């Protein structure tokens, strides 16, 4: 779902938040509900360094920079050249230019050569298996797991995460169980799960996940906290829970 703002005189070619603007006209995937939910929800601690895998326009990095007051260095890795350039431009134009750095790279190669490790990794990853053609190769790269499979994503996150780190993703509900099964086979365990539905009368259509990794005894000791989030009430107004989660970002909240 892509958000449309109806406030007049907003800048075009992107999305205006309360404290920053995200230009996305050069990106295959525009600012949408999935990314905003993840950026607003991710549990933050006293992080050492944050990584956004497949950062696109740089939305998640900007949201996490706002939430942390720019206290933590944030790296974004993006394969698509046009998107990575736009992400860097968005970061440079934001109040947190000093703490965000964008790397135009394939995350698989980056994970094999990077020497730094991260206490928090986030991703709004490709989610469709190959099928119906997209309008462009750029959009297909952003949406389809042919470019970055979930197996490869988990492997890269495992290589780059600190021992006590956290990996957070947003996924379509239809992909979540398969993703969790893959994760468990690679010594990951979900410690937080939020099932998201557009309304109480609609089925869950996206899932927010926080995963941690460790040895067998550590993994078995992790307890899952599972909750739900409804975006709109029956009257189609944003729910109080959704407003509380996103009010620091949306102009309309």
Swiss-Prot record:
Keyword Methyltransferase in annotation: yes
Leader sequence segment: none
A GO MF term: tRNA (adenine-N6)-methyltransferase activity
Primary subcellular site in the record, as a coarse category: cytoplasm
GO cellular component terms, A-Z: cytoplasm
PROSITE patterns listed in its UniProt record: N6_MTASE
Matching PANTHER family: TRNA1(VAL) (ADENINE(37)-N6)-METHYLTRANSFERASE
Role played: Specifically methylates the adenine in position 37 of tRNA(1)(Val) (anticodon cmo5UAC).
Family stated for the protein in its record: Belongs to the methyltransferase superfamily. tRNA (adenine-N(6)-)-methyltransferase family.
Listed name of the protein: tRNA1(Val) (adenine(37)-N6)-methyltransferase
